[in-house]
């Protein structure tokens, strides 16, 4: 299982780390690090066949530091995701499930 920060310690609008590798059946937990509103959105074109992008996404904002969201990944492959309000700033991430 892996934890990803929403926002760097420096305040940068990034997922930290932006790329993680896990085994099938493991969980990724995103934690709001900086107090900016962030969410986690998976694009249906950026997930493996058979994975449910909508079910993995957390479109409601995590506003306060320490707020978190977890998702379990059962299907092997590469998952691309982004933060909706900060996508233009390059706030994107990748999860590789083995």
Swiss-Prot record:
Signal peptide: none
Membrane topology recorded in Swiss-Prot or TrEMBL: Peripheral membrane protein
Cofactor(s) the protein requires to work: Cu(2+)
GO molecular function, one term: electron transporter, transferring electrons from cytochrome b6/f complex of photosystem II activity
InterPro entries linked: BlueCu_1, BlueCu_1_BS, Copper_blue_Plastocyanin, Cupredoxin, Plastocyanin
Domain of life of the native organism: Eukaryota
Residues annotated to bind Cu cation: 38, 83, 86, 91
Record's GO cellular component terms: chloroplast thylakoid lumen; chloroplast thylakoid membrane
Subcellular location(s) per record: Plastid, Chloroplast thylakoid membrane
Residues in Plastocyanin-like domain copies: 1-98
Main location: plastid
Keywords carried by this UniProt record: Chloroplast, Copper, Electron transport, Membrane, Metal-binding, Plastid, Thylakoid, Transport
PROSITE patterns: COPPER_BLUE
Function: Participates in electron transfer between P700 and the cytochrome b6-f complex in photosystem I.
Family named by the database record: Belongs to the plastocyanin family.
The name this protein goes by in its record: Plastocyanin
Lineage: Eukaryota, Viridiplantae, Chlorophyta, core chlorophytes, Chlorophyceae
Gene from which the chain derives: petE
């Amino acid at each position: 299982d892996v934890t990803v920060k929403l926002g760097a310690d420096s305040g940068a609008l990034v997922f930290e780390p932006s790329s993680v590798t896990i085994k099938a059946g493991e969980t990724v937990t995103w934690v709001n690090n900086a107090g900016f509103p962030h969410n986690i959105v998976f694009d249906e074109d950026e997930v493996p066949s058979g994975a449910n992008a909508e079910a993995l996404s957390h479109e409601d904002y995590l506003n306060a530091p320490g707020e978190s969201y977890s998702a379990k990944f059962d299907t092997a492959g590469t998952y691309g995701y982004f933060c909706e309000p900060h996508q233009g700033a390059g706030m994107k991430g990748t999860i590789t499930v083995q």
